[in-house]
Curated annotation (Swiss-Prot):
Belongs to the G-protein coupled receptor 1 family. Muscarinic acetylcholine receptor subfamily. CHRM3 sub-subfamily. PANTHER family: 5-HYDROXYTRYPTAMINE RECEPTOR, MUSCARINIC ACETYLCHOLINE RECEPTOR M3. GO terms for biological process: acetylcholine receptor signaling pathway; adenylate cyclase-inhibiting G protein-coupled acetylcholine receptor signaling pathway; calcium-mediated signaling; chemical synaptic transmission; G protein-coupled acetylcholine receptor signaling pathway; G protein-coupled receptor signaling pathway, coupled to cyclic nucleotide second messenger; ligand-gated ion channel signaling pathway; negative regulation of heart rate by acetylcholine. It is found in: Cell membrane; Postsynaptic cell membrane; Basolateral cell membrane; Endoplasmic reticulum membrane. The muscarinic acetylcholine receptor mediates various cellular responses, including inhibition of adenylate cyclase, breakdown of phosphoinositides and modulation of potassium channels through the action of G proteins. Primary transducing effect is Pi turnover. Changing residue 533 to F: Decreased affinity for acetylcholine. Residues 1-66, 130-141, 206-228, 514-525 are extracellular. The gene is Chrm3. Pfam families: 7tm_1. This is Muscarinic acetylcholine receptor M3. It is a multi-pass membrane protein. The chain crosses the membrane at residues 67-90, 104-129, 142-163, 184-205, 229-251, 491-513, 526-545. The modification Phosphoserine is found at residue 384. The lineage of its organism: Eukaryota, Metazoa, Chordata, Craniata, Vertebrata.
Amino acid sequence: MTLHSNSTTSPLFPNISSSWVHSPSEAGLPLGTVTQLGSYNISQETGNFSSNDTSSDPLGGHTIWQVVFIAFLTGFLALVTIIGNILVIVAFKVNKQLKTVNNYFLLSLACADLIIGVISMNLFTTYIIMNRWALGNLACDLWLSIDYVASNASVMNLLVISFDRYFSITRPLTYRAKRTTKRAGVMIGLAWVISFVLWAPAILFWQYFVGKRTVPPGECFIQFLSEPTITFGTAIAAFYMPVTIMTILYWRIYKETEKRTKELAGLQASGTEAEAENFVHPTGSSRSCSSYELQQQGVKRSSRRKYGRCHFWFTTKSWKPSAEQMDQDHSSSDSWNNNDAAASLENSASSDEEDIGSETRAIYSIVLKLPGHSSILNSTKLPSSDNLQVSNEDLGTVDVERNAHKLQAQKSMGDGDNCQKDFTKLPIQLESAVDTGKTSDTNSSADKTTATLPLSFKEATLAKRFALKTRSQITKRKRMSLIKEKKAAQTLSAILLAFIITWTPYNIMVLVNTFCDSCIPKTYWNLGYWLCYINSTVNPVCYALCNKTFRTTFKTLLLCQCDKRKRRKQQYQQRQSVIFHKRVPEQAL
């Protein structure tokens, strides 16, 4: 924000020297005497007139109703600005859900807006009403320093928010790993330090750099911005350039969000088609409890390989094998949810040398090398149980310890129609991974080993259902992530739009004043400068409109419902704790 030197100048008094048009001979005095007296009288009369004008009219030439209207309007806006930004700061303090990295930037922006509401708005209103600066040169320089540092910090914070949103969407893996609160604090600190270094020293000490103060008494503006060309240059650096950068970044954010929305829609459609198969083999033939032979395809070993790792917690009551239950598990896709079990998925990259042991308690681990991420996204059919791949390195024998004894591996099922045992032994041909340097078929066949692991039809069915559940979880996580990104983008768009609307009129006048310094009335300068302040009033409204958490927290604070909210939160946590203990089996604790 650039305060133009003509925006609040005291009225000029032309034609003061018109009474001195007579020649020296008419006055009967020497030329030098008349000139000296005339000069003295002109300056004395001018000074007395100005002094009498300013001291006798503290309202600056305004009527009482004009003063009341200006004071009421600006005072109301200042009060709303102060209350709104205090609400943002307090909401960030009391609500842990708001303590995200993105909201740290909004907190910094709220602090800058609060400074403007407390100091800048009120002093500038006094300056407008009195039509002169009556607080002295030091107070003038301090006000301008605080005003410009806070305003520039707001712009810098908007730039930081824009870049943060842009990198979060375009580089989600690399940038978000480094996106911590500590790093956010460093960026916020840099924004404030840069703003302070750019404006405060120049405003406070420029008169000492040039050797004199050129700002007239009763006026308050930045001395080095008295030239329109310099004023326009600062407007380019402080407004036009940041707005251009933020607009470009927001456009890129919008395009990337639309692209990810389309990808998510395709992923959801793919998942729906896969679930519609209801675990029927692609050939159309139903499967019984016969044995399957699952053979792993030979793959090259890479330095790091990703596995889908799942952990199951089974209670004893949910594991009663019978023919009816086998049929029910085979035909119904909801039986997975009916079991008293919980599953958690984590995607982790493990090195080839990492040894993963299997649990021999009620909790046991199954490590399946599921299809790659890209294939999950692009394919519409999940692989059948024949195509399930098992890693020989990470999948050992699966041991399940029941209450009194361990389940023993059983032989393959015979010609009977019904399943009589819990598990059947399924031969699995496992091929150890081949080193990247060995590409010939001879070397590959030499490294192959064969192992037999206990695996039943029910295990294959559960694995397939887990694959579907995994896909559903991936889709859900992507959908939730996209929703959060859209909310953050909406908040950014609202803040950016408010910034452009409130700051553009004044900076357009700065551009016009460069070519025509008398084309813009003083009243327009005052309105344009005050409109820049209104941006600090609008920002908290943007947070509330675009963020439900901010909105509910504001409502809670305004209605003094903090205690009720804490009680509800404690009750919710207690209920969740009870549900968690019910789900986790006692032997797993």
